[in-house]
């Protein structure tokens, strides 16, 4: 289990509908539930549910950051006309019982109004935005992920089927960028591909899901 997930769960009890955990942590929880050996992951990737976000959640999250005493605090903002989003990354807690890294992604600007003394460092969005978070700027992927999520053992995580869609898309996008000569880590590309098959093995033969056309097309490309 990801280090600090129990602390995270206790801290955000009552706020489960304000966020969804995606990425490796969500995969790990599903793998443990299906008696698979989870691959190691040290970060918690979170998307904020804009429609359910409250000032109370923002205040609670800041308390979490202060309690952990994260030494590295980064923020990236994209104010372009097509995609507007904010991305936060908190790393290296002084209290090592907390998660090593927590990443927050919001499709709207200005939702997380941390205090002026938060000491958050601006970073280039294009450099640091995670592959899964970037995909969630797409309405179809965002809405499908939110709709196909559940509260599991006190934390809100993406379901198996939505993780498969996200991982397929990440694999496709990263592979295309690498073919164009852009710098992409082959290990990360391979990781997404392997995750798809690990997750698919957890689906029952009777499981059927209706996908938006764009997601269906990406699954077929994969």
Specify the residue positions occupied by each region the protein language model found.
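Compositionally biased terminal segments of proteins
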Residues: 1-222
């Amino acid at each position: 289990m990801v280090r600090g997930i129990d602390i995270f769960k206790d801290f955000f009890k009552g706020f489960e509908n304000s966020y969804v955990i995606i990425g490796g942590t969500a995969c790990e929880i599903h793998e443990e539930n299906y008696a698979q050996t989870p691959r190691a992951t040290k970060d918690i990737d979170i998307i904020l549910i804009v429609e359910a976000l409250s000032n109370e959640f923002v205040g609670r999250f800041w308390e979490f950051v202060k309690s952990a005493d994260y030494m590295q605090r980064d923020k990236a903002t994209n104010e372009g006309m097509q995609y507007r989003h904010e991305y936060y990354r908190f790393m290296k807690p002084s209290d090592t019982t907390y998660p090593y890294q927590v990443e927050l992604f919001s499709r709207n600007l200005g939702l997380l109004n941390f205090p002026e003394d938060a000491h958050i460092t601006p970073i280039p969005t294009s450099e640091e935005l995670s592959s899964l978070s970037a995909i969630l700027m797409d309405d179809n992927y965002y809405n499908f992920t939110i709709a196909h999520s559940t509260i599991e053992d006190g934390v809100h995580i993406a379901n198996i089927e939505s993780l498969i869609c996200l991982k397929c898309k990440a694999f496709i996008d990263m592979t295309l960028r690498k073919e164009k000569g852009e710098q992409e880590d082959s290990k990360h590309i391979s990781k997404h591909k392997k995750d798809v098959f690990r997750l698919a093995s957890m689906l029952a033969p009777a499981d059927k899901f209706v996908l938006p056309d764009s997601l269906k097309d990406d699954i077929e490309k994969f």
